[in-house]
């Protein structure tokens, strides 16, 4: 038993887990969790609180697993917790791969560099697409390492699982991971001159790459197609999926001017500039013009006005890079380190290996354009790509060709070499920490509408409907938004709804209110509207579509808290 324990403590698995768990604990101890994008908050809200697993961003299987475990882990937001644990597992997998190929000493250095550059963002700023990029990086490296060792045991299957979970969180990054997987194969084949082998020997070299590639593609695409099928299984889920896709497309681009396209917008039911303003703000009304058909029309107009050509993104990437240089953020530091690693790579490797960095850089540039094109946005197009470039470059090091005297010289364990390495790592760590804390945006607690929250909680018999623009600010100061890891209480937002697409239908039914939120606001009892903006446009809309000849619908001020006004809405004769 003692020998087994000692062997376990000396194993590469324990080495990888121990390092990355310690790093995770340190970062969590000195930082605070926050959402990098409000999208992940809404994903966690719908999955963990409302148990609505139909989503165009998150795979249905992952949503179901997360939502089911939420019934057990009540004190945690499982969607966020899983991203933290999966990030730690992915970093550990990358460390394991490095330790297996290069030994623990080099793996330790490589791991510290990767964690210094990327772990702050993964553990403090929650974003599913970044977690997906890390999972896919780790998964494909585990698969490549299994091919190198010709052993398809537990580490290989863990890598496959990481690829699967990466596709669950962001399927668009799946193809980026595949591109780097193929790039490594091509580079390895050329560097080792395998293409000169006779066909039979080349086939035995080529076969495992093809089989692993085909297997991963079939599994990844198959599970994504299953999620797509479930999301489109019936009219209700299909409409939700369609709305989510269109809403993402339109939100990522500037809305067209109503005056320039009023004829097209009139054809889908938006009959005035005021209605269009409500539509842009996020109001949704299936019975009238503020619906999915209008979203589709606006998306078409946006596509015509701003044709999103794949190759046009190249110039935009340079402008993004210039922005990172000016801001001196973590992207710039990561890019500088990548250049340094590539210089070391070219210096250490033979000429036939030295083209690897250029190959990865070219694929990374194309991948950035693809991600920007696929996501219709410039946000986070470089983060996952930089992670993959440096990880695959590190894995591509090959010290086997060095002579014994050269190898001893490179791996010299003298105090001078160790001291220089420590100084470089400390400087890199300090610079990255300063950049991180300099760019962090603290929560403005003085703007938190605490009095409004208290008023809403004190009156559970009332039902409050939020204006969509007001809702964004209202939500952003709730405890669950400020503290992403906290589990949702059973009464979180239980008497709060909105004018957007999704509604608390069960709450409306239980309160004997119409499931049409506009009818519920006008004719329901104890229903109030919370709005920070001017209301006359909303009054005009309600009078036009829900008014009666013998009365007028008006907003009446009831109370005001922290700049938010609570209105009662009713008919006045």
Language model features with spans:
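Extracytoplasmic loop-helix module adjacent to an early transmembrane segment
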Residues: 16-56, 67
